[in-house]
Amino acid sequence: MAQVTMKEMLDAGVHFGHQTQRWNPKMKPYVYTARGGIHIIDLQKTVVRANKAAEFVKEIAANGGRLIFVGTKKQAIEPIQEAAAKCGQYYVTKRWLGGMMTNFETIKSSIDRLRKIDTMKEKGEFNYLTKKERAKLEKEYLRLTDFLAGIRDMKEMPSAMFVVDLPKEHIAVAEAKRLGIPVVAIADTNSDPESVDFAIPGNDDAIRSIKLFSNLVADAYLEGAKEWEGKLRTMTDKQSDVAKEAKADGKEEAPKRRGAGAKAGAKEAPKKSAGPAVVKATKSRKLVAAGTAEEVEIQAELEQGQSTDESAE
């Protein structure tokens, strides 16, 4: 299980909070003392909260959920991108665009535009543009890449969010809360720990501290993802076994139906025809039966996609 230790946190400077005059009183339960005008965070409480948050992230991944990392301050950009790449999840490190999740359809159109320009570049279509048109597209491409690179493959809402610097990312947190998306965050002494589901008391300014918790979340997600892969394999194996059993049962029943009520090797007496053979089939139907007009009632089964064919007709 992914966890952090007291030594790792001390080495990363997790215990250093903000100046005492810049604190949020709601962080009082997590403050150990104050020294030199700076609050010192109680790491015994931090380790408990951090490991609890890691368990939650693992559970999200174990159920097939996705995660988004959010950290747009200078110190957070590199650690966030590395952690997101490590576990293959989404990230935002430029600026959180208002409505990035609550108005995702609009953001999705920008993502589609980014993909379209990508395709144009791959096909060499830029070579047929004028210098001015090419420069305009390049500028648009760079702007879209800056803002959307970390979510370009996002097709639906993530199951959880990890945030660095709660006061700075308050818009992202508010959108997640509105959509019912749980939030895990590093909560420095100037933060409101009650604004998120899993607050990890700690320094959100030091790069080493940010990297420590970002990697903790990434490692926890990877552990859960392995469990999810195992569940998928088990489900696939069960479906395969069921299909094999059904196929085997079909082979056993077929000879019984053919030989029922007749001796081995005996010839069947020719049946008298009561009328011309009837075969019903349409463009959207399988050929399901053939017989005589008086003896056979045909029930056609629609192919998969029945509704599409009928509406087209």
UniProtKB/Swiss-Prot annotation:
Q: Which GO terms describe its biological process?
A: translation
Keyword annotations from UniProtKB, A to Z: Ribonucleoprotein, Ribosomal protein
Residue stretches in coiled coil: none
Family annotation (InterPro entries): Ribosomal_uS2, Ribosomal_uS2_bac/mit/plastid, Ribosomal_uS2_CS, Ribosomal_uS2_flav_dom_sf
Which CDD domains did the record assign? Answer: RPS2
Is Zinc a UniProt keyword of this protein?
no
**Which Pfam families did the record assign?**
Ribosomal_S2
One example GO MF annotation: structural constituent of ribosome
Compositional bias, Basic and acidic residues, is annotated for 233-256
Family annotation (HAMAP family): Ribosomal_uS2_B
Question: Any idea what this protein is called?
Answer: Small ribosomal subunit protein uS2
Organism, by scientific name, is Bdellovibrio bacteriovorus (strain ATCC 15356 / DSM 50701 / NCIMB 9529 / HD100)
Q: What is the lineage of its organism?
A: Bacteria, Pseudomonadati, Bdellovibrionota, Bdellovibrionia, Bdellovibrionales
